[in-house]
């Protein structure tokens, strides 16, 4: 029913490499990292044999005495028994790795299609197809023959200018093309921002629950993470009172995600204003993740954090992926929203430029198409997507309320997700959120995202960015699963 390329687990690959960075006179220590695409083990862990470095003796033994074919050489490229920082981060803090692991629990011989309710990629569903204007812009850029070259590290000038104009429409000041840096999706934008801010001894404030890529990148860069809570009883508002208590002189930034992934809430102008004032008082910049910007369908309109750039300097992360439903196009950006030029002395633009000069680029033809994508996409397309998400979010919220073992504290008003609490005391034989998701996948072929990877143990994240019939089917399967696993003692029910 659905494209399989998003769900198939990759081959497990590990390799060791040395990386060092130097930006504007600031040296970052060389470190050894190990990257791995293998998914983490959650339940029914089997004892694994540690892989030791290849020695001459081992090579000789495996080669019948060690012929002179190089196998007797002691190679220093090893498969470590314990992964490096990035491998560890990817193992514990990657939605993709967790999704692969849970997908492996699905019975491939089952008669029903797998329902992907774990991640926000509705592009496989026909009703969520991107705008014709966006497709035409890409086709025209390709056919022109003008965009087959390497782009500048920071992006094509015309594309940067188009993003600046696009964002400026909702801000009380104008951005210039020099304020915009194009990235290979929002994921690379996170990598850039976290990497340039990481200094020995510094820390960053991240939301809990939150998007795990921030924690993974912080771990990779030896940047200490300090969490502030989002309060479910208050519509997932930020616990502002806790910010000053967890920050100190070494705090470098705070991350805000709005509209929120994973919670589905949208922050009001007043709440964002308070966040800006707290950040100003602490002397830290705000990183605002607006990848789901304008995907709102509740009572609160989307307010760009950049509106408060006169209070506190802001780095905005955005992309085409979600609003245009094209995550595979890998086009994102970092925007410096700093009308008072507070960050000028920090040379943050130079740091970003230097990083991107030694990093990968978004595809040139997508950059070439970007001005026409932003300019020509009709409002009717955006309205259609909002109408779809409004309908499916309502279906999701109503369906969750009808399932006794799960609780939704706040109806989603934006993004593509909702966080749901598991009432495990009502269930038999379910140990935690990961166990719930694995057993659900095995028995019902429904894939959910466990809250543990998002910082909320015994919660799950559900996406409603899916066709309505599949969503209804998925909710019915979750309900059936809970009914089968409910505790027999009726006194346990409320």
Curated annotation (Swiss-Prot):
At the top level, the lineage of the source is Eukaryota
Q: Which SUPFAM superfamilies match?
A: PLP-dependent transferases
Instruction: Please list the cofactors this protein needs.
Output: pyridoxal 5'-phosphate
In this UniProt entry, the residues modified to N6-(pyridoxal phosphate)lysine are: 322
Q: Which reaction does it catalyse?
A: nicotianamine + 2-oxoglutarate = 3''-deamino-3''-oxonicotianamine + L-glutamate
Which keywords does UniProt give here?
Aminotransferase, Pyridoxal phosphate, Transferase
Q: Which Pfam families match?
A: Aminotran_1_2
Q: In which tissues is it expressed?
A: Expressed in companion and pericycle cells adjacent to the protoxylem of roots. Expressed in companion cells of shoots.
Q: Which InterPro entries match?
A: Aminotransferase_I/II_large (IPR004839), PyrdxlP-dep_Trfase (IPR015424), PyrdxlP-dep_Trfase_major (IPR015421), PyrdxlP-dep_Trfase_small (IPR015422), TyrNic_aminoTrfase (IPR005958)
Query: What causes induction of this gene?
Result: Induced by iron deficiency in roots and leaves.
Ranges of Low complexity compositional bias? Answer: 24-38, 48-62
Q: What is this protein called?
A: Nicotianamine aminotransferase 1
Q: Which organism does this record belong to?
A: Oryza sativa subsp. japonica (Rice)
Gene name per UniProt: NAAT1
């Amino acid at each position: 029913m659905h494209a399989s390329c998003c769900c198939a687990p990759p081959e497990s690959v590990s390799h060791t490499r040395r990386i060092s960075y130097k930006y504007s006179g600031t040296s970052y220590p060389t470190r050894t990292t190990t990257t791995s695409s293998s998914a983490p083990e959650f339940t029914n862990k089997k004892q694994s044999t540690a892989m030791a470095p290849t020695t001459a003796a081992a090579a000789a033994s495996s080669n019948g005495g060690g012929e002179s074919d190089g196998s007797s050489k002691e190679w220093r490229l090893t498969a470590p028994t314990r992964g490096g920082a990035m491998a560890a981060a990817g193992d514990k803090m990657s939605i993709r790795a967790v999704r692969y692991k849970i997908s492996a629990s699905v019975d491939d011989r089952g008669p029903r299609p797998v329902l992907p309710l774990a991640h926000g990629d509705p592009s496989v569903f026909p009703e969520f197809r991107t705008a014709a204007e966006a497709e035409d812009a890409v086709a025209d850029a390709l056919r022109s023959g003008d965009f087959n070259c390497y782009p500048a590290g920071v992006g094509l000038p015309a594309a940067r200018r188009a993003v600046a104009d696009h964002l400026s429409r909702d801000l009380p000041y104008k951005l210039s093309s020099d304020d915009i840096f194009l990235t290979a999706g929002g994921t690379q934008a996170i990598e850039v921002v976290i990497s340039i801010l990481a200094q020995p001894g510094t820390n960053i404030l991240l939301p809990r629950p939150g998007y795990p890529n921030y924690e993974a990148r912080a771990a990779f860069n030896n940047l200490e993470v300090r969490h502030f809570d989002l309060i479910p009883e208050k519509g997932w508002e930020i616990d502002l009172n806790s910010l000053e208590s967890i920050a100190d002189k070494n705090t470098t930034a705070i991350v805000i995600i709005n509209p929120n992934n994973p919670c589905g809430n949208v922050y009001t102008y007043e709440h964002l204003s308070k966040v800006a004032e707290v950040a100003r008082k602490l002397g830290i910049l705000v990183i605002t993740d607006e990848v789901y910007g304008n995907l709102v369908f509740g009572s609160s309109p989307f307010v760009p954090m950049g509106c408060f750039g006169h209070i506190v300097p802001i780095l905005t992360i955005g992309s085409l992926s979600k609003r245009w439903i094209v995550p595979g196009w890998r086009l994102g950006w970092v925007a410096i929203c700093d009308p008072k030029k507070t960050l000028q002395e920090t040379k943050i633009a130079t740091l970003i430029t230097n990083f991107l000069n030694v990093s990968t680029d978004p595809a040139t033809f997508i950059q070439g198409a970007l001005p026409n994508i932003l300019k020509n996409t009709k409002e009717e397309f955006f309205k259609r997507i909002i109408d779809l998400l409004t309908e499916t979010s309502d279906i999701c919220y109503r369906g969750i309320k009808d399932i006794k073992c799960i609780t939704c504290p706040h109806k989603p008003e934006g993004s593509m997700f909702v966080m749901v609490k598991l009432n495990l005391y009502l269930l038999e034989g379910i140990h935690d959120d990961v166990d719930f998701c694995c057993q659900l996948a095995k028995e019902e072929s429904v894939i959910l995202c466990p809250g543990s990877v998002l910082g909320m143990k015994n919660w799950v994240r559900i996406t409603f960015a899916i066709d309505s019939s599949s969503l209804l089917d998925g909710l019915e399967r979750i309900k059936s699963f809970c009914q089968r696993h409910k505790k027999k003692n009726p006194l346990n029910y409320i």
